[in-house]
Amino acid sequence: MPRKGSVAKRDVLPDPVYNSKLVTRLINHLMIDGKRGKASTILYDAFDMIKKQTGNEPLDVFEEAMKNVMPVLEVKARRIGGSNYQVPIEVRPDRRTTLGLRWIVQYSRQRGEHTMDERLAKEIMDAANNTGAAVKKREDTHKMADANRAFAHYRW
């Protein structure tokens, strides 16, 4: 942690094809070992597949998927009197977006299709239709928060 105030949050540039900062952030989450070109190729190929299969604009499908994946509540461990409680807290907007992107990439990597662009396209389409592993993760997170609602008064 810096001694002289907080570090300024850097803003990402919108991507050149779709002119969207969200797409740039997805490329950054996809990127492994700094290979941005490879990550952007995978994403744009996945968006082409979405366009072919759904007939809709891929950016709209992706934004719908993000809306369905982003969590509203999560639990955070809080130690009180020698025992740990899972305290439900509201998720900040920037963290919601980050978690949504992280879960889409994580669960698309675990899918069984042959290429990563296929996996990503299918996971985004599933998320847009409110199915898929990323949406299930969000539901599980909300269930955990709901089950621990009794400890909500421990919020800080």
From Swiss-Prot:
A GO biological process held by the record: translation
Stored Gene3D superfamilies: Ribosomal protein S7 domain
InterPro entries, sorted: Ribosomal_uS7, Ribosomal_uS7_bac/org-type, Ribosomal_uS7_CS, Ribosomal_uS7_dom, Ribosomal_uS7_dom_sf
Family annotation (PROSITE patterns): RIBOSOMAL_S7
Record flagged with keyword Cytoplasm: no
TM region(s), chain numbering: none
Listed Pfam families: Ribosomal_S7
Coiled coil residues, start to end: none
GO CC terms in record: small ribosomal subunit
Keyword rRNA-binding attributed: yes
Domain of life, per lineage: Bacteria
Keyword vocabulary terms for this entry: Ribonucleoprotein, Ribosomal protein, RNA-binding, rRNA-binding, tRNA-binding
GO molecular function: rRNA binding; structural constituent of ribosome; tRNA binding
Disulfide bonds, paired cysteine numbers: none
Assembly and interaction partners: Part of the 30S ribosomal subunit. Contacts proteins S9 and S11.
Family as reported in the entry's similarity comment: Belongs to the universal ribosomal protein uS7 family.
Function recorded in the entry: One of the primary rRNA binding proteins, it binds directly to 16S rRNA where it nucleates assembly of the head domain of the 30S subunit. Is located at the subunit interface close to the decoding center, probably blocks exit of the E-site tRNA.
Protein name, entry field: Small ribosomal subunit protein uS7
Native source organism of the sequence: Lacticaseibacillus paracasei (strain ATCC 334 / BCRC 17002 / CCUG 31169 / CIP 107868 / KCTC 3260 / NRRL B-441) (Lactobacillus paracasei)
Encoding gene per record: rpsG
